[in-house]
């Protein structure tokens, strides 16, 4: 399946457009690597949610962080995902599915070719 984004760059604007016509601007604090981290979080959740499960989930939040190398090429050196589950009825099943997702998520696997990867799961219900 082909995925497409078209970048447009002038002195005044920097953005890319997706096939649905959505314009995504590159601004201070929302450049290519922020979009990459968003793509990682989105792909990871989509893969996780597609897994067959017995338990119920109320909410899942995924924070993706990447640290770039300081030498050229400045690819990611270390990437981490913090996955926070709320209202997870079967925590053991959820953790097992997260591990399986790390093996199957295409964006996670692509980034893992250049970066060390960490995944941390925590449950907010446990902190109340």
Question: Where in this protein do the model-derived segments appear?
Answer:
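Alpha-helical metal-binding/catalytic segments enriched in His/Glu/Asp
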Residues: 43-44
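Extended beta-strand/beta-hairpin segments
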Residues: 1-38, 48-128
């Amino acid at each position: 399946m082909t995925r497409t984004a078209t970048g447009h760059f002038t002195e005044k604007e920097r953005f890319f457009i997706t096939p649905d016509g959505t314009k995504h601007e590159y601004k201070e604090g929302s450049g290519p690597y922020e979009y990459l981290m968003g793509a990682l979080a989105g792909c990871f959740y989509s893969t996780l949610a597609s897994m067959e499960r017995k338990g119920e989930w109320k909410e899942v939040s995924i924070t993706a962080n990447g640290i770039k190398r300081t030498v050229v090429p400045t690819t990611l050196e270390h990437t981490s995902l913090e996955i926070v589950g709320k209202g997870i009825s079967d925590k053991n099943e959820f953790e097992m599915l997260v591990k399986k997702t790390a093996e199957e998520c295409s964006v996670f696997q692509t980034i893992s070719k250049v970066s060390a990867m960490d995944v941390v799961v925590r449950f907010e219900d446990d902190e109340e």
